Amino acid sequence: MFTLKKSLLLLFFLGTISLSLCEQERDADGDEGEVEEVKRGFLDIIKDTGKEFAVKILNNLKCKLAGGCPP
């Protein structure tokens, strides 16, 4: 019974240490995560603008090839 208590206490102690280490890493990564979100937002804007531009060009080409462009 004593060895069971000892091993449970050891598991609890190791779990507490690993949990505190994970929280410290998460706090340290939290600052970097904000920068990554801003970069992602900026890249999404560029990507969406590029898609809109490509769609307009393809529509103009399709219109010119078909020969029926509305003014």
UniProtKB/Swiss-Prot annotation:
Residues 23-40 form a propeptide. One of its GO terms (cellular component) is membrane. It comes from the Eukaryota. Residues 1-22 form the signal peptide. Disulfide bonds join C63-C69. Belongs to the frog skin active peptide (FSAP) family. Brevinin subfamily. InterPro entries: Antimicrobial_frog_2, Frog_antimicrobial_propeptide. This is Palustrin-Ca. It is found in: Secreted; Target cell membrane. It comes from Aquarana catesbeiana.
